[in-house]
Amino acid sequence: MVGESTIRNFAIIAHIDHGKSTLADRLIEACNALSDRDMKDQVLDSMDIERERGITIKAQTVRLTYAAKDGVVYHLNLVDTPGHVDFSYEVSRSLAACEGSLLVIDSSQGVEAQTLANVYKAIENDHEIVTVLNKADLASSDPERVKSQVEEIIGLDASGALLISAKTGMGISDVLEAIVHRLPAPVGDANAPLKAILVDSWYDPYLGIVILLRVKDGVLKKGMKVAMLSTGAVYQVDNVGVFTPNKQMVDSLSVGEIGFITAGIKEIADCKVGDTLTEDSRRCDNPFPGFRATCPVVFCSLFPVDASSFEHLREALGKLQLNDSSFTFDMESSTALGYGFRCGFLGMLHLEVVQERLEREFDLDLTATAPSVVYRVTDKHRVTKEVHNPNDLPESHEILGVEEPWIAATIMVPDQYLGSILALCNSKRGEKVDLSYTGSMALLKYRLPLAEVVFDFYDSLKSVSKGYASLDWYVDGYVPTEISKLTILINSEPVDALSCIIHKSKVESRGREICERLKDLIPRQQYKVAIQAAVGAKIVARETISPYRKDVTAKVYGRDVTRKMKLLEKQKKGKKRLRSIGNVNVPQSAFIQALKMKD
């Protein structure tokens, strides 16, 4: 058991690619937590996708032992948090487990939107914040400009900001000294009933469900019976341990310590991030504030390209859900694509990561339908239900009203790109809330429909700003809207996989776009193929694929016009009969390309 006066719990918060995981590597190296043989880049990022994309997806923790210059040995608990907006709830719960934060900012890039969002979460949790300016060895580094941004935009005193290079190791000893002397020790009562916050959970093939937690009060011991306050579920603790970053079993965790337990838990859904864990026989009175169950906000359907892979896909989704309780899936069927699953995600990055993991780790070939958001639909009987699948949307005469989710977005961009960003936001039905300037940077606040953002808003934002704009957002309630179900017909047959829910103002343009794309993708047939976009009985767009035409009059010599007319009439009847009995063979690649929606 460790005395709380020598414990420091801290998180590293930063925008994507500002050097957060690299700094964690240098701290682990400086504290000799791993041998040279075991040390690798982004040691806390366990997934290949995390390393390749340079992002952190799952919150990770490591206990480091540091002998400070004052002769005291400190125990540092580092929580490496995700930086992307999709995982912002994970960040807020990780920050609730700490007393301080290292605010890492790229000294050449400056403050960005997600830096802002995460530092405000740290301030809400009463964190002591140490500002660290990374990449100070670069020629483009401008520490003074970034310090003034920190003071003007965030409102923190940047006079004590540390200049470091996580890549070369410059200034790492200063960071460690700042952690032990500038960040506070945890406060708690070891004699009070056990109270611990659940930071993360995942599935381990040997240990079962592993819970990462921080003890606030009391002592957590092996063999203790513990209860989850949100679900009331009771378990007996089998193992208690810490990450150094390798697993190390211990007898107990006391006030301020961060570690893991296993307790024979079978379902990851029982372990909700942010939940309070307490001793069953002596429960704490009040749970940690701010707990909420994470709900998917973006949905799409995943179908295996090879129908025989359906069971393999079901198993793969089940395994991913063991590590990610915010991800949901339900079976569905499509006449065009066969059997698949309707999946729910926290955002577009979450969707991309899950799809990439399915394809890479489980060797699956998948078709994904267009992403959709959750609409609240009130029917004429005044019954409200949530709809995210176009096939579940009632007919227009059955609908009394519809509400769609809107987001509050914060965009930071150099002022020379402001005009393009404003035009982009307005084209997405956005409403400007605020605009302020700090030096050459514009801080823009907008409200936007989530349905407009999930398609390609982030890509368009980066494109019009040459990659300089940064975005942070959160769902900010529901707003009444007018939507339509756009149905795609091929030779008068509806294709359910291409149906989508769209705002009424975008119906014609989106319908025309899909029809034009399908015209290029569907092979020509022996007969004419009509591709139509419809809303109810009204056709809003149409494209026609011309048939192949065999020259049946080639063998007719001379000027026998009646013979030619007879052959042409016979060909016309044959094509008419062929059209009535023939199905248009739409290749799988056509669905995939048609569903890659771009404005």
Curated annotation (Swiss-Prot):
Residues 5-187 form the tr-type G domain. GTP binds at residues 17-22, 134-137. Pfam families: EFG_C, EFG_III, GTP_EFTU, GTP_EFTU_D2, LepA_C. It is an enzyme of class 3 (hydrolase). It is a peripheral membrane protein. It catalyses: GTP + H2O = GDP + phosphate + H(+). InterPro entries: EF-4, EFG_II, EFG_III/V, EFG_V-like, EFTu-like_2, G_TR_CS, LepA_C_sf, LepA_CTD. It is found in: Cell inner membrane. One of its GO terms (biological process) is positive regulation of translation. Required for accurate and efficient protein synthesis under certain stress conditions. May act as a fidelity factor of the translation reaction, by catalyzing a one-codon backward translocation of tRNAs on improperly translocated ribosomes. Back-translocation proceeds from a post-translocation (POST) complex to a pre-translocation (PRE) complex, thus giving elongation factor G a second chance to translocate the tRNAs correctly. Binds to ribosomes in a GTP-dependent manner. This is Elongation factor 4. It comes from Anaplasma marginale (strain Florida).
